[in-house]
Amino acid sequence: MKRKINYTHIAEPTVFENVFPTYLTNETMMARKQKVLQRMETEKFDQLVFYADKEHGSNFEYLTGFIPRFEEGLLVLNKDGAATLILGNENLKLCQHARISADLIHYPAFSLPNQPMAGEQKLSQIFETLLDETAQKIGIVGWKMFTTQQLSLIHI
């Protein structure tokens, strides 16, 4: 069955020239972190784990100022404000440019395929060192769909 397609001319969008970007100040970034920490206290979260990839990075970026490009990443935020970034090879350099102070853990499995995997450890081992044993409530922000074959990789 053939369908007739009608094209319509519409007005070009308005172009705003000489508009300068708004840069987020350190004060703004710290205020964001404080808002999250206050909400954690209100909701009684001891820790939050933020998942990010190129398509799902806004929550992570809200605090760190960047989205892990090409890869995945995690941000673990403790109720005392301490933060840890878990990043693959391509993003290791971004920790020093993050807008919040954070420790860095290299997790090669978050790297692109065929990258060096030296020092690889299980994510569950990383969490054993990071997650507070006395924590009563740990939240997860973001998501990743795992297939049944990949479920065996997760021991959280």
Where are these regions (language model features)?
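A composition/biophysics-driven feature that prefers long, compositionally simple stretches
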Residues: 1-155
